[in-house]
Amino acid sequence: MKLEHPDRLMNRTPLSLAALETHDAFAERHIGPDAASQQAMLDTLGFATRAALIDAVIPASIRRAETLPLGPFAQPKSEAEALAALRALADKNQVFRSYIGQGYYNTHTPAVILRNVLENPAWYTAYTPYQPEISQGRLEALLNFQQMVADLTGLEISNASLLDEATAAAEAMTLLQRVGKPQSNVFYVADDVLPQTLEVIKTRAKPIGIEVKSGPAADAAAANAFGVLLQYPGANGDVRDYRALADAIHAAGGHVVVAADILALTVLMPPGEWGADVAVGNTQRFGVPMGFGGPHAAYMAVRDEFKRQMPGRLVGVTVDAQGKPALRLALQTREQHIRREKATSNVCTAQALLAIMASMYAVYHGPRGLKTIALRVNRIAALLAAGIRHLGYATVNDTFFDTLTIDTGARTAQLHAFAQAKRINLRRAGDTRVGVSVDETTTRADLADLLTIFAQAAGATAPDIDALDAGLLPAPALPPSLERTSAYLTHHVFNRHHSETEMLRYLRSLSDKDLALDRSMIPLGSCTMKLNATSEMLPVTWPEFGRIHPFAPAEQTVGYREMIDQLEQMLVAATGYAAVSLQPNAGSQGEYAGLLIIHAYHESRGESHRDVCLIPASAHGTNPASAHMAGMKVVVVACDAQGNVDIADLKAKADAHSHDLAAIMITYPSTHGVFEQNVREICEIVHAHGGQVYVDGANMNAMVGLTAPGQFGGDVSHLNLHKTFCIPHGGGGPGVGPVAVGPHLAKFLPNQRSTGYARGEDGIGAVSAAPYGSASILPISWMYIAMMGAKNLTAATETAILNANYIAKRLAPHYPVLYSGPGGLVAHECILDLRPIKDSSGITVDDVAKRLMDYGFHAPTMSFPVPGTLMVEPTESESQEELDRFIAAMIAIRDEIRAVEEGRADREDNPLRHAPHTAAVVTANEWPHAYSREQAAFPVASLVANKYWPPVGRADNAYGDRNLFCSCVPVSDYA
């Protein structure tokens, strides 16, 4: 049956109320092509219906027999209905004043940053800045982040964010293992490190043979450790002078990692000045809500000698084709997409959007404002200490920045009861102690309430705050020897945007430089840059989600946990597995968790020797990097000429490693953009040799509602909620990478013993700092699924496949489509082969990518999985009009290439070799090129009315790596 145009329905009268109700309205907003457009594209492909196309694309042997079993969410909700339902869940949460601390603090998000960064699609819909010429705004914001972290830590170089403080500490551990003394496998963790950090470190250390020892910091130098982790200030609030200890550790051949509070570093001597080799931490308290644990931007800073070992993205300064400063991602050869199992880390997505928020918090407040905030926090803590001592309590720590640990003896339970009555959470530090951490939001009234609670428990009257303040010596809590004397944030960017007017204009100037989904489609293969709907994003800013501490009592988080349970069941339905954990806070971490689960399963069966992981040659680089981190040996399986797993080679490798085979990691549909016909056979071969099947869920957008990895042989998968389920990419994070497993693996799902979170009774431990990972962005995916319902989620998948095949069909006469399935069809993406073009014209895939910028497009994925190709994924959200605009651009570029091939254009002086063209170049007095200015800037007529100008010319990557500079650029350099 052909799709019926909705206008025809409107001509039928009378229409019932049921016919006029708009439960499907959101799906019509989310799916780009309307019925008429879809039919036109189907006609181009030679299919009468979408169903007929899908039958031809997906092997019948793996098709889902039943409708997506979403239970109460099977029927779509309107945007208003979904928001109301989620509001009802949010209202079940109780927003208490939280003084739990432990790395999470209340903070004020400046409204100008909330509205113009977090709520601005120009920022949150952007992709990781692999194409630097159209990413200069967010690259500058991330460079500000790096400068901020380097300044505050006192170390030479910082990366552009990591996932959370605990995983950053684990990354520091493995960094120091690579550079440390080879005779030691011991990593020593001081006993006042945050408990969630220690737990993640233990999880990360076990599979790679690192022995974690924990004890008093004073014993660290004698531990013969390659690295030592110190907390500054400590978990109990104590501020210790570690200078002599750091010297002793270095003398013993070890290195020092310091987990440092970013706000405290505005008033405390930075770790880089007293011996730290690496500093890690969290920037959450720089304007990012707690959000029940995330997302937040962690940081890592290192000494210059370790810069090539540092994980994560690194923004560096280079020059463009005109010799002007330009920013780019530096030292990319460290990363998993290039070095695979030899990479420094498996991290792809980090926390770019949150890093940008934190950096803008520093820009807005400046060094003076930040120090004022820190001094006020410290003063409130000092007044609290004076008051409770006046009431007869003793503090465990005499020195502190913002945290007190208090001996409360038999009054402890009563204190917590009094606090609960005032809707206050104190930290439960054992049966006889209470912890209190104050923050930027703590007011005089809050301090009075805290003193009243302690006074009630003591049977006394709370002391007067003004009297305490008048009698308190300046800064009594910080050791004078550790007072910060060095300057920080001296660069002009941190000292000029302090009025809201200036800040607003600065943010606008940066966002105008970038190309995000709010301007045009981003056809990146394997990235699924679909719509991030406004209604999905709205709940992220609700205080009922944002102001919840991850370690708050369970009775205060009922709504959160109910929403999370519902989302887990939605994902179970989509994947065909039995259970899901949402703890992994990136796809890379979901991969890693899945492999640890496989290892735990084998171990439980007395087969811990199984450590070989088969990985197809076409796999994304995170797969081998994750396998290496999980302690597995990577064995590569060949692919055939069509890009499919070579079954003969798979059988040979499985036979050769049968005794030790742990798993195979496959991506489905494959990284070549095809539904492999023999995926069931692949799974059966591995199972026959005792292995487990890991199905990478990066391409889940081609499967939802049509097939499911848990039904065709998969044992475990990770998903990317920031791809398939609409969490935005944020310019390089946040992401969520849930791990989904079959029933036999459910008991091994991640848990967190330090907080009592037990998802699996034999769980692998914690893989992120918070029990539910990046919990505050989970409502985005909940909203998407609730508003789509089963039928429309399936329709979205079908439309994504339709759009990809339409592009492949239209572009095939101009660019060979490298891989396809039966009938010449592809899955949800297609690979265009540009290698013959390079041979005939000298034009490279890089030239085409840069030229697309002149046409107003972000390039498709370059040279993955095959060098010299472009991988195009349009998603279901792009209209036929936008697809046609992209197709027209690609055809026009092919004509420009043909001019070079035929000698009508010079092989060097042509629009592709000099792309992208900036406004400054096009309007300069001199025009040295054989082609016209109009051809350079306006190659198609549509650009005259709506033109995006790349802010810089082509970035010189080699120059940037040869002359590595990863700090803010002086204003004079832009002159």
Swiss-Prot record:
Q: Write down the superkingdom of origin.
A: Bacteria
Q: What does the record give as EC number?
A: 1.4.4.2
Catalytic reaction equation(s):
N(6)-[(R)-lipoyl]-L-lysyl-[glycine-cleavage complex H protein] + glycine + H(+) = N(6)-[(R)-S(8)-aminomethyldihydrolipoyl]-L-lysyl-[glycine-cleavage complex H protein] + CO2
Note the CDD domains from the entry.
GDC-P
Q: Which UniProt keywords apply?
A: Oxidoreductase, Pyridoxal phosphate
- What Gene3D superfamilies has UniProt attached to this entry? Aspartate Aminotransferase, domain 1, Type I PLP-dependent aspartate aminotransferase-like (Major domain)
According to its UniProt entry, the protein's GO biological process terms are: glycine decarboxylation via glycine cleavage system
Parts forming coiled coils: none
Q: Which InterPro entries match?
A: GcvP (IPR003437), GDC-P_C (IPR049316), GDC-P_N (IPR049315), GDC_P (IPR020581), PyrdxlP-dep_Trfase (IPR015424), PyrdxlP-dep_Trfase_major (IPR015421), PyrdxlP-dep_Trfase_small (IPR015422)
Q: What does the record give under GO molecular function?
A: glycine binding; glycine dehydrogenase (decarboxylating) activity; pyridoxal phosphate binding
Post-translational modification N6-(pyridoxal phosphate)lysine, affected residues:
K723
Q: Which cofactor does it need?
A: pyridoxal 5'-phosphate
**Listed GO cellular component terms?**
cytosol; glycine cleavage complex
Q: Which Pfam families match?
A: GcvP2_C (PF21478), GDC-P (PF02347)
Say what the protein does. Answer: The glycine cleavage system catalyzes the degradation of glycine. The P protein binds the alpha-amino group of glycine through its pyridoxal phosphate cofactor; CO(2) is released and the remaining methylamine moiety is then transferred to the lipoamide cofactor of the H protein.
Homology family: Belongs to the GcvP family.
**Assembly:** The glycine cleavage system is composed of four proteins: P, T, L and H.
The protein here is known as Glycine dehydrogenase (decarboxylating)
Biological source species: Burkholderia pseudomallei (strain 668)
Which gene does this sequence derive from? gcvP
